[in-house]
């Protein structure tokens, strides 16, 4: 199985989550590439069986959370018929940011198979557990 993990990170938390996801995927026996959204390898993306795309949760708790830097996510090539996993990182309450990320990716042609926001203080625990959950759901 070929998996690509793309991330958009402002402070390094989402990059760290992407690296942990990539490590867990590799430990499960898949071929994996981890890249920032600004450095996409289009052939890798086209050949991928599964794509993880991540960013951070932006916004204030009372004013509505949303995917951070959504404009850069929209620049990812269309993901028609690609199985995609959305992930985000947050500090406090992610609200419904994962659902908003799912909608953004589905509007971009993706088939979103899972979405989760990971607490930036618990990445080492939450990221591998999320990968195990996703891989148990996905057959390619």
Locate predicted features.
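Short hydrophobic segments within beta-strands
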Residues: 6-8, 87
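Extreme N-terminal starter segment of soluble prokaryotic enzymes
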Residues: 1-4
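FMN-binding flavodoxin-like domain, especially the glycine-rich phosphate-binding loop
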Residues: 13-16, 22-37, 44-140
């Amino acid at each position: 199985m070929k998996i690509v993990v793309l991330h958009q990170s402002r402070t390094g938390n989402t990059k760290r989550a992407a690296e942990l996801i990539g490590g867990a995927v590799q430990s499960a026996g898949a071929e994996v590439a981890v890249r920032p959204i600004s450095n996409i390898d289009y052939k890798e993306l086209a050949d991928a069986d599964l794509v993880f795309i991540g960013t951070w949760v932006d916004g204030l708790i009372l004013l509505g959370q949303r995917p951070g830097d959504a404009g850069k996510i929209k620049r990812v090539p269309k993901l028609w018929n690609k199985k995609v996993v959305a992930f985000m990182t947050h500090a406090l309450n992610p609200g419904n940011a994962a659902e908003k990320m799912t909608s953004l990716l589905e509007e971009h042609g993706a088939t979103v198979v899972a979405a989760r926001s990971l607490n930036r203080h618990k990445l080492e625990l939450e990221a591998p557990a999320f990968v195990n959950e996703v891989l148990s759901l996905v057959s390619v």
